[in-house]
Design a protein with these regions (language model features):
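N-terminal targeting and processing segments of secreted/endomembrane and organelle-targeted proteins
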Residues: 2-3, 26-29
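Bacterial N-terminal signal peptides that target proteins for export
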Residues: 2-17
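Bacterial N-terminal signal peptides
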Residues: 15-25
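Extracellular/lumen-exposed scaffold segments
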Residues: 28-190
Length: 190
């Protein structure tokens, strides 16, 4: 009843309430797109010896109509795409690989920007401790990025991930795996 009384007293209340509902509804829809960027992780070996280096890859799929900024940007006000890893005593990330970005012009920028779109593969070299005991381990990381369309950008986001790997004794032979993915990474040029 109070709501009806307020409406009768002030005809401007209805448009304001409807406007607020629509504004909040549209805001939630645009920010709720959690599926703009998806990732999948890979390791290069089925087992790792203590003190050995192996590669990891992060396959990043960006939805059509969207892009993310490259890892190195000429515009200091944009958010770069970045792989980050949690520091620990068992592993050390020694080198990163980011693909060559595309140069594109968008409505929200005065100049061309370095961007990634579609599907890209990021990578890193990981060195294990020489003291690493045989067993299963997890490397924790995150992908930081900012998704944009042709007109504007969403708030920066991060996707946390874990990469499981197995340490084996020096006497055990290991095999390379996921070579289809790793053949697309050129660590030599980085």
């Amino acid at each position: 009843m109070i709501f009806q009384t307020d409406i009768k007293r002030n005809n401007k209340t209805i448009p304001v309430i409807v406007g607020m509902i629509l504004l909040l509804g549209f805001t939630n829809v645009s920010e709720g797109k959690s599926d703009i960027v998806e990732i999948k992780t890979f390791i290069s070996k089925d087992g790792v010896h203590p003190g050995e280096t192996f590669k990891i890859a992060v396959l990043v799929k960006i939805s059509p109509g969207w892009h993310i900024h490259a890892s190195e940007l000429s515009d200091q006000f944009l958010i770069p795409t970045e792989l980050l890893f949690e520091e620990n005593e068992k592993t050390e990330v020694t080198q990163f690989h980011y693909p060559e970005p595309k140069l594109e012009k968008y409505e929200y920028s005065a100049s061309e920007l370095e961007v990634y779109d579609g599907e890209i593969i990021l990578g890193a070299w990981v060195k294990t401790s020489s003291e690493l005991k045989p067993g299963k381990y997890t490397l924790k990381g995150e992908l930081d990025y900012q998704a944009c369309d042709n007109r504007s950008c969403l708030s920066p986001k991060k996707i946390e991930f874990e990469i499981a790997f197995k340490s084996v004794p020096l006497s055990k032979k290991t095999e390379f795996i996921n070579q289809k993915i790793f053949s697309k990474l050129d660590f030599k040029k980085d």
